[in-house]
Regions:
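Catalytic core of DAGKc-family lipid kinases
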Residues: 1-68
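Glycine-rich phosphate/pyrophosphate-binding beta-alpha loops
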Residues: 12, 16, 71-85, 150
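Short acidic/glycine-rich loop or secondary-structure boundary segments that cap or lie
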Residues: 16-19, 63-65, 78-81, 105-108
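Gly/Ser/Thr-rich active-site loops/lids in small-molecule metabolic enzymes
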Residues: 27-35, 78-80, 86-107
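Exposed beta-strand and adjacent loop surfaces of beta-rich binding modules
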Residues: 50-52, 94, 141-143
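ATP/nucleoside-binding phosphotransfer catalytic cores, i.e., glycine-rich phosphate-binding loops
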Residues: 57-59, 64, 89-90, 99-187
Length: 187
């Protein structure tokens, strides 16, 4: 059984998806403030168990071990200004990938600012990859959230739909900036 979904920003698996699930549950109950997402991250950190994951990028096995979380996308920012993919470029035709290996709470706590200032790859537990086609298998299955919405579980495949979005802008904008956008297809 396969589903096709599209994303415009970032997808998260494992820990990321658990945080989104807790956040959605609390919002549904009427709770809402600017620190709610951070609170959900902290609560999830102590209950999430890392999962055995295999990651292929462009048909090359790049990771086969325990992972806490995975972020895949075309943009830098998600979840209230976090930069899980600080080197992502929306129009380069590639998906950026951050693989977060199991890490102790205190190690992350003292480096939490890197998640917001673009320095996430300074944390030794976080690996960076890039490619046009990403495949993920895990045991047990891990959940996935796409642009903040829970969508399903592994196995997952991500690929880029080149120049799939057309944007109408003024000539003045084109003279200043040139960023044709792309979308991603989640299979």
């Amino acid at each position: 059984y396969r589903q096709h979904r599209y994303m415009a920003n970032v997808a998260g698996m494992g820990f990321d998806a658990m945080v989104v699930k807790k956040y959605a549950h609390l919002k549904k109950k009427g709770h809402s403030n600017k620190w709610l997402y951070t609170w959900c991250m902290i609560r999830s950190f102590f209950s999430y168990k890392s999962t055995g994951v295999k990651v292929w990028i462009d048909d090359r096995l790049v990771y086969n071990n325990l992972l806490m979380s995975i972020a895949i996308g075309v943009c830098k920012y998600n979840g209230g200004g976090m930069q899980q993919l600080p080197e992502a470029v929306a129009d380069d035709g590639l998906l950026d990938v951050s693989l977060i290996r199991p890490v102790h709470f205190w190690h992350i706590l003292f480096r939490f600012r890197y998640l917001f200032n673009g320095g996430i790859y300074r944390i030794r537990h976080i690996l960076q990859e890039r490619g046009s086609r990403i495949r993920i298998e895990s045991s047990p299955e891990i959940s996935v959230e796409v642009d903040g919405e829970l969508l399903g579980e592994s196995p997952l495949e991500f690929s880029v739909l080149h120049r799939a979005v057309r944007i109408v802008v003024s000539e003045e904008f084109l003279k200043r900036e040139s960023y044709p956008l792309c979308s991603c297809n989640i299979v």
